[in-house]
Amino acid sequence: MNKKCQGCGIILQTEDPNKEGYTTNIENKVCTRCFRLKNYGEYKITQRTNIDYKKILSKITDEDLVIYVTSILNLETKYLQNFKNCILVVTKLDILPKSLKENKLKAKISLLKNYNNIKDIILVSSINNYNIDNLYNTIKKYRMKNNYFVGATNSGKSTLINKLINNYTDKNIIVTTSAYPSTTLDTINIELEGINIIDTPGLLNEGSVINKITEKQIKTINPKKEIKPRTYQIKKEGTLVIDDIARINYKTSEGSMIIYIANEVPIIRVGETNPRLKNYPPKKISIKKGEDLVIEDLCFIKFTQNTELNINIDKEIKIQTRKTII
């Protein structure tokens, strides 16, 4: 019987150090890649596509429950409608200002994600152990055959599963977590008091900023504590540059924007003639009052008025608007 890595789910092997699942001793619980990532922060790139993940997700039946995990920063739910029975779990609640009311957030998210297959929406913080009991009891309530945790890379899915393991079992299992894509490589089965939990690899979000920035930047954009929203008063033709990732040029009259982004990410004002990021062709975006602008896995921006923007950014990074959640 093949033995799986407890960290990423890949089958362990001792023959080829250049292939996935390599370990020096088959008795080890984790592969070398997971060991070095956890203990030394060394990340080894693994090429994956959503074709690989779709094969795994095709095993999910109508008798199963999908716990669809998404970060509060972007609320990605691309594959959510593929499943019959879902709980939508919004993670990283702790990174938003404490002044925000959970019930109002949940109500606005419910309007954005008004799908018939969603049984519940639960906002959680794995770091603060907030609403974890609520999630666990909700999973138990439905008593489905299997309980699949599904979500995009960097959604906080594996961190959430580790919190469940820590809270409700005495098993010495730690799913490998990191800010990098493709940390989990195959399914990981975990039994919690008779409930079958299945962690799946993080879905690759083709429009994510993570695919286009450096490893150092990936660490920086991942919020580690409560975000301090940054408000900018902007005049016509005013320009902001976000960490050599995005250049935002304000085309309309005076107004303000409030940026929700990791505190460590640098944002600077530049003049119109400054060439930074002008090598990217501008995307023209129209924003209505009461909408957010979302740059996938980087930030969301709230505007106080109707606005016309030019945004210089890699063409493959997804930008979208939505009704504001704040």
Where are the model-predicted features located?
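Canonical P-loop GTPase G-domain recognition
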Residues: 95-155, 161-174, 178
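Conserved beta-strand elements of the Class I
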Residues: 65-68, 148
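Glycine-rich nucleotide phosphate-binding loop and flanking beta-alpha elements
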Residues: 74-76, 156, 167, 204
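Conserved Rossmann-like nucleotide-binding pocket used by diverse enzymes
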Residues: 68, 89, 122
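Alpha-helix C-terminal capping segments
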Residues: 57-61, 78-84, 112-113, 138-142, ...
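Helix-rich effector regions associated with P-loop NTPase G domains
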Residues: 1-66, 73, 84-87, 93, ...
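Residues that form or flank phosphate/diphosphate-binding pockets in enzymes
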Residues: 77-78, 130
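Short hydrophobic alpha-helical runs that function as membrane-insertion/retention elements
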Residues: 87-88, 148
